[in-house]
């Protein structure tokens, strides 16, 4: 929005030309989103408390979690507000890629909101009926994916970048739609499963979004894309603004979500953030890199799949409890230790992911 205003005002003062630079707008988007999150946080928490929107806790979970019962949830609302306002202010809204990410972000946020609401109303952790939850997640993802495919179905926009391989970038064609669907829905649910401890999901999200800000900038820059041997996607550069808005909103939320948490993001936050990360990965053609950098999310999701599969097939559990962060808690690890260890692992994986862009 401010891009349009600056384009008009630059005729009166060339200083407004600074708004045309992605780097400037990226920094401002981060600061704006973080400022909004810090500003509205106390009021959002107060209103959630008044509405009695408190977290429900599994009875079979770690005993240390029982004290979390009643902590305000659905704090992801403040994340969505911060990202939305910051993006609308600083992104070039003529860019269709920005709207694809916002569509998934708020669409998944709406599904998460309903899921959280039913958990609170029923006073259990069941939430929205699973088949309806996945139905709406699938509908939103497919609408976005078909839109992305229609807008950019040239060679670069549907290539699959394989880490560590410079020249091997297979053309997916129609299979782009299938892969993209699973990336968006899968990432959304993986982040959702990770969101079980104070700050456990938001910090890895911040780290991965920061990395994607760099990748989006390189992907949207012809010279850097050629240098790194990655597909050049002209519209991708504007996604830097969205990535830094996610980082800023995440930092603002972390202020209130760090141990011991004053508020939880709920499904309204985790589903939407995961969906946004998945969509960004699809748009910059780095789906496989997301698997590396978001390794913590992947392991959390796999632990649940393996646990459920093992119990159904053998009536035996692999872990003491899934997702895997609860396994470590039941082994006696203090919650802060589990959280920080997962943060460190994510930092390592993000750095490895960035290095793969050059080591090919």
Curated annotation (Swiss-Prot):
Keywords: Cell cycle, Cell division, Cell inner membrane, Cell membrane, Cell shape, Cell wall biogenesis/degradation, Magnesium, Membrane, Metal-binding, Peptidoglycan synthesis, Transferase, Transmembrane, Transmembrane helix
GO cellular component, one term: plasma membrane
Name under which the protein is recorded: Phospho-N-acetylmuramoyl-pentapeptide-transferase
Protein's membrane topology: Multi-pass membrane protein
Protein task: Catalyzes the initial step of the lipid cycle reactions in the biosynthesis of the cell wall peptidoglycan: transfers peptidoglycan precursor phospho-MurNAc-pentapeptide from UDP-MurNAc-pentapeptide onto the lipid carrier undecaprenyl phosphate, yielding undecaprenyl-pyrophosphoryl-MurNAc-pentapeptide, known as lipid I.
GO process terms (BP): cell division; cell wall organization; peptidoglycan biosynthetic process; regulation of cell shape
Cell division recorded as keyword: yes
Keyword Transferase applies: yes
Species, as recorded: Actinobacillus pleuropneumoniae serotype 7 (strain AP76)
Similarity section: Belongs to the glycosyltransferase 4 family. MraY subfamily.
Names of the cofactor(s): Mg(2+)
Gene from which the chain derives: mraY
Pathway the protein acts in: Cell wall biogenesis; peptidoglycan biosynthesis
């Amino acid at each position: 929005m401010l891009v349009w205003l600056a384009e008009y005002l630059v005729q009166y003062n060339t200083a407004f030309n600074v708004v045309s630079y992605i780097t400037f707008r990226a920094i401002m988007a981060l600061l704006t989103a973080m400022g909004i999150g810090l500003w509205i946080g106390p009021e959002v928490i107060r209103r959630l408390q008044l509405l009695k929107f408190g977290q429900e806790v599994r009875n079979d979970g770690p005993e240390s979690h029982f004290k979390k019962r009643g902590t305000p949830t659905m704090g992801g609302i403040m994340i969505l507000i911060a990202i939305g306002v910051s993006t609308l202010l600083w992104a070039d809204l003529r860019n269709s890629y920005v709207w694809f990410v916002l569509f998934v972000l708020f669409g998944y946020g709406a599904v998460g909101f309903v899921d959280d609401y039913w958990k609170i109303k029923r006073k259990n952790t069941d939430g929205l009926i699973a088949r309806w939850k996945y139905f709406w997640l699938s509908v939103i993802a497919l609408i976005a994916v078909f839109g992305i495919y229609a807008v950019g179905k040239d060679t670069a926009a549907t290539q699959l970048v394989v880490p560590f391989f410079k020249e091997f970038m297979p053309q997916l064609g129609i299979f782009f739609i299938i892969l993209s669907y699973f990336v968006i829905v899968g990432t959304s649910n993986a982040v959702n499963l990770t969101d079980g401890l104070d700050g456990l999901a938001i910090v890895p999200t911040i780290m991965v979004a920061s990395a994607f800000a760099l990748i989006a900038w390189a992907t949207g820059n012809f010279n850097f894309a050629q240098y790194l041997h990655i597909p050049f996607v002209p519209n991708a550069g504007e996604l830097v603004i969205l990535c830094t808005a996610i980082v800023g909103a995440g930092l603002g939320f972390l202020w209130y979500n760090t141990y011991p948490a004053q508020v939880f993001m709920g499904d309204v936050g985790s589903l939407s953030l995961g969906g946004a990360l998945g969509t960004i990965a699809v748009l910059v053609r780095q789906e496989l890199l997301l698997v590396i950098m978001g390794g913590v999310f992947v392991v959390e999701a796999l632990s649940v799949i393996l646990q459920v599969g093992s119990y159904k097939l053998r009536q035996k559990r692999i872990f003491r409890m899934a997702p895997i962060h609860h396994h470590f808690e039941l082994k006696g690890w203090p919650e802060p230790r589990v959280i920080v260890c997962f943060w460190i692992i994510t930092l390592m994986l993000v750095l490895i992911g960035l290095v793969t862009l050059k080591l090919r």
